[in-house]
Amino acid sequence: MKLLITGGHLAPALALIEEIEKTKKNIDIVFVGRKYPIDREKTLSLEYKEINKKNLTFVSLEAGRLTRVISVSSLIGIFKIPIGFLKAFFVVNKYRPSHIMSFGGYLALPIVFWGYIFKIPVFTHEQTIKPGLANKLISFFSKKIFVSFDEVKNNFPANKTYVSGNPVKPSIFKIWKKPFEIKKDRPVIYITGGSLGSHSINMHIKKIIVSLLHRYIVIHQTGDTKEYHDFEDLLNIKNQLPKELQSRYFLVKHFFDDQIGYIYS
């Protein structure tokens, strides 16, 4: 059996892979994702690093998408939509998976479309409370749709939608590696915008980090998007703080699977 996994939500995808590796030894997994998080950058994406650590097949795919904001980059994205569909055809045709599991997003849409055309069973998972346009389109081609929350069901056809919850990696309940040592003498706040980070969250934290550090230990996962230089800007802010406050501020670009358990411990 060959399973092709694709989509924008990395954490539940990794949780599924971890469960498959533990219980199903005869499944060949192919992961279709972005090698670089943003087209203009050459920083390797977290999904590429994680999948390669697991020695699984990683196929890089670039695809365009529709956005609500009109700009030069959004227009380029529109022109890349047919190119993405063409590339996705060759991916699906080459690997011919027996099943496709989508975790949503613009990258998954062309893969799911061709899976449907090739009569490959497609399944999708919606992680968030408000489905995006891509997942609404993907739902049409899907045999079954899994959602994290009961209130999301109304966004999809009732006859093939199931509340599964959000897949969670068992690794977060175990301490495999300590990325740093925390002296837990006060409450801990973990700030994250997901694998890519969140520029808007990072911008807000820049304004309030000093006041937070007077009362809390802060673990801040910024992401590694070179377009905004958030990690570098926040590192500069940290270096200008008094030593006592610096010792309470743990700044990282991202955490790997074997590190996240310590954060939640």
Question: Where are the regions that the model predicts?
Answer:
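Glycosyltransferases and closely related glycan-assembly transferases
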Residues: 21-22, 49, 86-100, 107-123, ...
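Short acidic active-site motifs
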Residues: 87, 132-134, 258-262
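Conserved nucleotide-sugar phosphate-binding/catalytic loop shared by glycosyltransferases and other
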Residues: 5, 26-76
